[in-house]
Amino acid sequence: MQNEKLRNVAIIAHVDHGKTTLVDQMLKQGGVYRENQETVERVMDSNDLERERGITILAKNTAIQYGDTKINIVDTPGHADFGGEVERILKMVNGVILLVDAAEGPMPQTRFVLSRALELGHRVIVVVNKIDRPDQRIHEVIDEVLELLLDLDATPEQLDSPMLFCSARQGIASYSPDVPGTDLKPLFDTILSYIPAPEADLDQPFQMLVSAIDYNEFVGRIAIGRVERGVLKQNQEIAVCNYHDPDAPAKKAKAVSMYEFQGLGKQPITEATAGNIIALSGIGDITIGDTICAPDCVEPLPFVKISAPTMEMTFSVNDSPFAGREGKFVTSRQLRDRLFRETLKDVSLRVTELEGATDAFNVAGRGEMSLSILIETMRREGYEFQVSPPRVLYRTIDGKKCEPIERLVADVPSECVGAVIEKLGSRKGDLIEMTPVGSRMKLEFLIPARGLFGYRNEFLTDTRGEGIMASVFDSYAPYKGDLNRRSTGSLVSFETGESVSYGLFNAQERGALFIGPGVKVYEGMIVGVSPKQEDITVNVCKKKQMTNMRAAGSDEALRLVPPRKLSLEQCLEFLADDELLEVTPENLRMRKTILNHEKRMKATHGGKKK
C-alpha cells in the first residue's frame, strides 16, 4: 500500500546552482509564510557559516502542504566533501530533483550525488535553473545531462526523466524553455505525478532507520528518519539496535516526543505512520545508522555504505608561546570531547588518537572543505588548537601503493588554457577531455588529490580570477610518484616581539608579507612567503637605531606594501610538511613545527646528511 497523500523528495545540485533559493521559493508559494511576513534569503542555510559561504553543509528537512498532499523536501549539501550527509539522506526519499545551472551544466559534485541516487533506483526530475542568465546555453546543457545519465548507467525509466526550465530567483518554472512560466506550479505538479508515493505498510511492526541527528540543549539528541513500516504512538515502548555494535542486545526506550516537519519548523505529533519523515527525542545515546523498532520485532535495517575518508589532518593542543591567551577551550580533554562529538553527527568523519601522544588526534574526512568547515566551526565556538597540513590516505591494492585520484573540471577563458594545462600537468594531472563553450574552454582532468594542494590560488592567478574549478573523488589508482608541494619558501620570524615598520620594510624585500605593523609575533612564526624554495629568517621586530647626528623628522617615510591576508583554506593550502597552523578564536597563525631557529637548522641539516 502507498501513502498517496505524501511525497519525499531530495534536491541535488552543485554548489551555488540555486538549490537553497529554489527551496525558498517553494516555501513561499507553498504558503509557509504569511503574506506580511518578512523573509530571509536562503532560509534553509540556517548556520552562519552556510550563509557566509553560500553553501549548504548539513542536510535540512522541511515540508510543504500542496493541495491535500504533503511534500517532504530534503535540501542536501552540494559539495562532495559532505557526501556522508548526502548518501544517508538519499535513503529517506523516493525521488530527486536534479538542479543544473543553465550556463555551467552538470559539475563533478552533481555527478557524485546523482550516481548514488541512481544506484538506489530513485526517479529523477531534471530542473534547468538560471534560464535568465545572459550566458545560458540550455540546449547544450540538456545534452550534457542526458550524457551524464547514460554515463552513470541510468535505467530506461530514469533516462526518460521529465525536464523543467526554471528561474529560482524569480520563482517560475515551465515545461519548455521557449514558454516562460508564471510560478512553480509545473514543478509541484511534476513532483506529484512522477515521484512515487512512499510504501506504507501500517499493519507490520514499527521500524525506522536513523538518517540524521539534530541536537537541542533542552531535549538532547533528536533522531530523524523515515518510518519504513508500521505506526508509532507517543510514549510507546521501542527498541534501539546499535549500528556500531550489531551483536549488542537492543536497548529499550520510550517514544517520549515525536515531531513532523512543517514549513521551517517541527510540529509535535502523537502518531507517526509509515512513509513519513519524523523526528524523535528522548533516546539518550542514539547515533546515525541505528534502527528504532517495535520491542517484539527487533530487525535492524541495512545502512547505506558511506564512502571512506581520503584525507586526514592532525589536530593537537596549541603549544605556541601564545597558547591559552585567546581561546576558551584549550585542553586536550576538551579538544578530544569536541572531535568525538562531531563524529556522532558526521558519519564520514574518523577520529583516532595519535599513538604515543595524549594531546594529538588524527581527523580523517572526505576532503579539505569538510575539514576546514570543522576547524572554522570549532574556532567560532571558542576552541584553540593547532593543525597539520592535510595529507592524503594511501591504500595498498593488489600489493601496489595506491592514492586517491580526483576528477577535476575547470571552466577557463580560452587564452588561459595553456597555463592551466601546464600547471596541472606538472602536478601529475592527465587531461581527458577538452570542450569549447563559447569564448571559454571546459577542461576535464584526472589528478592525484595531493596534486591539488595549494593549487587553487595559482589557478585564480593564472585565469585572472575568471576561472571556475571543481573536483570530486574519482577512484584509487597506483601512486604517481613524488610531487613538489610548493615552489615557494616561508619568511620566518627570528625573534618574539611586536612587528614594526622598519623591520617590515627590510623584510618585504625578501618576499610578500602576511602581517602589518603592530602585530605580536614569536620566533618560528611564518610572517610571509619567499619567492625562493628555501625558508628565509627575517627580523620584523627590528627597530631603527637612532643617533644624535640624525634628526628624527629628516628620515624619508617608509613605504610598506599592504600585507596579503590569507583565509583559513589558503593557510591550509600554504602549509609545508614542517609547518603547522595555530587556530584561535581571534587569529590564524602559521608557524614552523620546530620554533627555535638553531634547532630547526640542526634538524634540517641532520636530515640531509642521512
Question: What is the role of each PLM region?
Answer:
Residues 1-100, 104, 144, 213:
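P-loop NTPase switch module centered on the Walker A-proximal segment
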Residues 39-42, 126, 152-164, 198-209, ...:
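Interdomain boundary/hinge elements
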Residues 123, 133-196:
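Canonical P-loop GTPase G-domain recognition
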Residues 167, 355-370:
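Short glycine/threonine-rich beta-strand-turn micro-motifs
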Residues 207-313, 323-325, 336, 488, ...:
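Conserved nucleotide-binding/hydrolysis modules and their immediate coupling elements
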Residues 231, 284-285, 365-371, 414-417, ...:
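Helix N-cap motif at beta-to-alpha junctions
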Residues 261, 266-269, 402, 447, ...:
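Long insertion/accessory domains within large nucleic-acid-processing enzymes
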Residues 320-343, 557, 561:
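A short, contiguous, amphipathic alpha-helix enriched in charged residues
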